C-alpha cells in the first residue's frame, strides 16, 4: 500500500484480525491504527516512509479490560516523515499489548511510546532513532503515574545519538514526569550518547539484570525539587494538571480493587477511599540492582538524591568488554555468562540472539 493520503489500515473494535506480510509506505498520517480492538496481530510487515507507523489504543486500564494486541516481527523505519516529533513507530494505550521481535530504526524522534497497564516491550532491536531531537528516549513514557505493571525486557537498544548539542541529551529509555511501575530487565544498551535509562520522579521502577556498553551514563534517577512540584502539577499547560487528572481516572472500579494497597488509603474519618497522593512527586520504591556497566561512568548519577529513595546493590563497573562478551569489537554482545556471574552472582542469562526479528 503506497501513497495513501490519510491513513493505511484502520481497525476499529475489531477482534482476531491479522495484518501480515504487508508493505506499507508513504502514508500521510498513520499506517495502521487499531482502535478499541482485541487480540489483533500486526506481523511480518515492512512499514517505512510514514508518519505514525502503528497506533494501538485498546483495552481499558481503569476497568482492567485487556486488549491483547500483538505487534510482532515487523521492520519499521523512516517514520515521523511529516511531524518530526511525537510520531512513533509504535504507540500503545490501554492494557495488555505486546511489542516483540521488531526491528525499528532511522527516525528523528522516539521509536516507542506507551502508557497503561500490563503492556510488554520485549526482544526488539532499536537503533538510530532520536537523531534530531533532545530530552527524549528511544522508548518514552510519561505523565501517567497510574500506569502499572509494564515491562521492558530483552531488548537491544543501540547507537542512539542526536545531532543537537544540548544539556538534556537523548537516551534509550526515558520514563518522564512521575511515570510509575516499570520492570526493566535483561536489556542490552550499547553506544548510547547520553543516559541509557532516565527516570524523572517515578516510583516502583525495577532496573535489574541489564547490560550497558559504551554508554555515557547508565542511569539517571531523580526526584523533582519542591518548586517543580507545583509547576508540573498545576502550571504547565501541556501537562494539563496530569497528577490530578490521573487521580480522577482511577478513583473507581477494578483498578482500585487491584491496586488499593499501592495507591489508595482511607480519609481521616476512615470511611471514604481516596487516592494516596502523599509525596507523590518524589521518587520512591526504586531499584537499581545486578546491572553490568562496561566502558561507561563508574556509577549512575542520581540528582536530588535526598528526595529519591532508591536501592542500589550488586552492580558491576568494568572496562574490559572482551571479558564479558564473545566479540564486542564486532558488536556481538553474546554474553559469557560465567564471567558475568563471577562478578555479579545474582545475574541471570540474557539471550542476545533473541533480540531481533524472529
Regions from the language model: what does each represent?
Residues 1-2, 16-29, 38-51, 65-80, ...:
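Right-handed parallel beta-helix
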Residues 5-10, 28-36, 51-57, 80-88, ...:
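Short glycine/acidic-rich loop motifs that flank beta-strands on beta-rich extracellular proteins
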Residues 142-144, 173-176, 195-202, 275-282:
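Short, contiguous acidic/charged loop-to-helix segments that flank catalytic cores in large enzymes
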Residues 179-180, 270:
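Active-site clefts of carbohydrate-active enzymes
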Residues 13:
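Extracellular repeat turn/loop positions enriched in glycine and acidic/polar residues, especially those
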Residues 222-358:
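Acidic, glycine- and Ser/Thr-rich low-complexity intrinsically disordered tracts
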Residues 59, 117, 142, 176-178, ...:
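Active-site beta-loop-alpha junctions enriched in small/polar residues
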Residues 60-64:
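Short, small-residue-enriched loops and turns at beta-alpha junctions
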